[in-house]
Amino acid sequence: MVQKKIIIVGATSGIGKKMAELYIGKGHMVGITGRRLDLLQQIKQQFPQEVEYECFDVTEKENIRHIQSLIDKLNGLDILVISAGTGEVSKELDWKIDKRTIETNVNGFAEIANWTFNFFIKQDQGRLAVISSIGAVRGNSWAPAYNAAKAFQSTYFEGLAIKARRLKKNVSVTCIEPGFVNTKMAKGNKFFWVVPVEKAAGQIIKAIEKKKRKVYVSRRWWIIAKLLKWMPYFILKRLI
């Protein structure tokens, strides 16, 4: 098996962290990022030979400098996964929450996705993935900015997938739309069809390996996605 150089943006907890662990278990080199230096250092101590890290917040400046630094440390890049995100409920439509959501899930995401896509196009190979959400399908009264931001991510990645195909480059673009995963962000125990984080991470890795354009995690969430997409507004407004 060829060892790959992988960067996971947002890998100190949840799906991102589990993906890093699974990739390491497969013998790959992994670059991780996050806002908390102590958590990054803990992972580095656990896997001193396999892990490199950069500590930064995607809402701040110099995102690309940190990504470039990780590429240098890994001596290359084959796969980049954008897992960083925020999903706080904004029941009272709090602008501070919505602003943070947009800065993280739209601005920070787009800057990294844009730069990485162009990087892969120039080297004529690479796999780019994002952890979006089933929430991308429709609006939600409890977290309007979150669902809107996830819709942006999914639509942006659809555009990148089309662009890569037209450019005839060996670049794959994978959008993952998970349902409820048992992480702190989802507070998964309260919901149905809750997926263990290890299962979710494993399915995502397989989707990236197979160069899938879009996948739902777990797979049966495609049913919910279709129902939501075609659900009349007068029904939707009573549910979410």
Describe the role of every protein-language-model region.
Residues 133:
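Residue(s) in the substrate-gating loop at a strand-loop-helix junction
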Residues 113, 149:
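Active-site helix of classical SDR
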Residues 12-13:
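Conserved glycine-rich cofactor-binding loop
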Residues 83-89:
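Conserved NAD(P)H cofactor-binding loop of Rossmann-fold oxidoreductase domains
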Residues 90-103:
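Short alpha-helical oligomerization interface
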Residues 175, 187-226:
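C-terminal helical subdomain
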Residues 47-62:
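Rossmann-fold cofactor-recognition segment
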